[in-house]
Curated annotation (Swiss-Prot):
Transmembrane spans: 5-25, 34-54, 77-97, 104-124, 150-170, 184-204, 207-227, 263-283, 304-324, 356-376, 406-426, 430-450, 469-489, 498-518
Membrane topology, as annotated: Multi-pass membrane protein
NCBIfam families registered for this protein in UniProt: PRK09395.1, PRK12488.1, sss, symport_actP
Family: Belongs to the sodium:solute symporter (SSF) (TC 2.A.21) family.
GO cellular component, one term: plasma membrane
Matching CDD domains: SLC5sbd_u4
Major site of localization recorded for this protein: membrane
Protein name: Cation/acetate symporter ActP
Disulfide-linked positions: none
Biological process, per Gene Ontology: plasma membrane acetate transport; sodium ion transport
Any Pfam family the entry gives: SSF
Amino acid sequence: MKIRHWSALSLFVLPALAQAEALTGEVHRQPLNIQAIVMFLLFVGGTLYITYWASKRTRSRQDYYTAGGRITGFQNGLAIAGDYMSAASFLGISALVYASGYDGLIYSIGFLIGWPIILFLIAERLRNLGRYTFADVASYRLQQRPIRTLSACGSLVVVALYLIAQMVGAGKLIQLLFGLNYHVAVVLVGILMVLYVLFGGMLATTWVQIIKAVMLLSGATFMAIMVMKSVNFNFNTLFSEAVKVHPKGLSIMSPGGLVSDPISALSLGLALMFGTAGLPHILMRFFTVSDAKEARKSVFYATGFIGYFYILTFIIGFGAILLVGPNQTFKDAAGALLGGNNMAAVHLANAVGGSFFLGFISAVAFATILAVVAGLTLAGASAVSHDLYASVIKKGKANERDELRVSKITVIILGIVAIGLGILFEKQNIAFMVGLAFSIAASCNFPIIIISMYWDKLTTRGAMIGGWLGLSTAVILMILGPTIWVTILGHEKPIYPYEYPALFSMIAAFVGTWFFSITDNSETGKQERLLFKSQFVRSQTGLGASKGGAH
């Protein structure tokens, strides 16, 4: 019972973990939705045209990785929101509210808490110190090759795990929403993702994410307005009517129904909070703006859009309780919701807007997946081409043309691997992969970034040992935990009793980095400490920072 309760929590706290709920159990295939197919084709046609347009404007390495630094703060804020808001969080959080009520609000807002960290501690310094990837920042005053190797490995592991989650989620959700075959859906997403990134680079990826964010926010806003209209825009009426029709009655207005293990809750909370600040595809977006001021604006707008979206999902969830729950049209013979609870928001779209709006929401779900996987692919490709190839293998002497070629080859390889893994993991519950992705981002990427920016005594030795310690501890504890050790490998009891490792792996990373830095008395270590002052000046003033193009 304890594990079951915690599993419910773990599936919904993160946007991508919310997706995992759609991946477990039987998928109820929906009939082919012609409106959804037409709107989806319009979206794909429009975004492929944008990719063609972007390809004409993507001539240099800077254009490919950062759209030439010409994206405005507002545009980048929308794109970050588009990169971060998942279709399944839309379906998953609203499904949680539909099933459990108030708990959904706690988790959807809890998922926002990583953004103030990025706004106040990271965005400005990241933009001033870096150029294309966060490894530029981590290696600013440390030894380039070992630090970039560690950063690239951390990035690629996070990208790979997140990509598997998105691809499997894409296949299952498209099967749910469109009635398409799972394998066809995965291959389709893989091909489109490669086309966007291969030809359009960051410029095409940015505009796909902006369009998706606008579509998702517009659709969710319309649904929320229609729900409120049905109760004369009175929240008291919405909640009191929902309590009357929900099987759990008044308990849907109380918190805490899903939390039974405080250590796991704390561990997942840390992964969520600090992992957000270590996601490579999110951090990469801060280099697309012209300066630190625009980077701060980006986070400000993104936080507003994401927060607004999660408030809408709460209204949508209660709207589904009121308008979908009592309606037998949306139930099967046994009285369960057609397609499972994850379809609550989709059925609500049908209830408030008919088949046309249902088609729109289904197309938005597909658009959302494409936007997220495009951002992940570009982050993975830049880690290989810029960090590993140009800086480690070629020791900073690679020419721009070769680096771009390596990046584009990596995009194709990532696309093939993503399709293969998506098909391979079709039957798996991949919630633990996303939890591991966030845990690794919090245990490896985040400590390196934050300590390199703020602590003057950091040395390469400390960063390397601490970073690898955090990365390996996160992976080992995840394997020894209940999800893999018991559920997948079939052992009777887990060696590590908690679902997520971040609480312990983050401590290992920070303590390891601190201890092995302060005990480093080498000449190299002393030189690295002396370089902190010049780094601090640049991080605060932007003097010497790479400049984006004019807007």
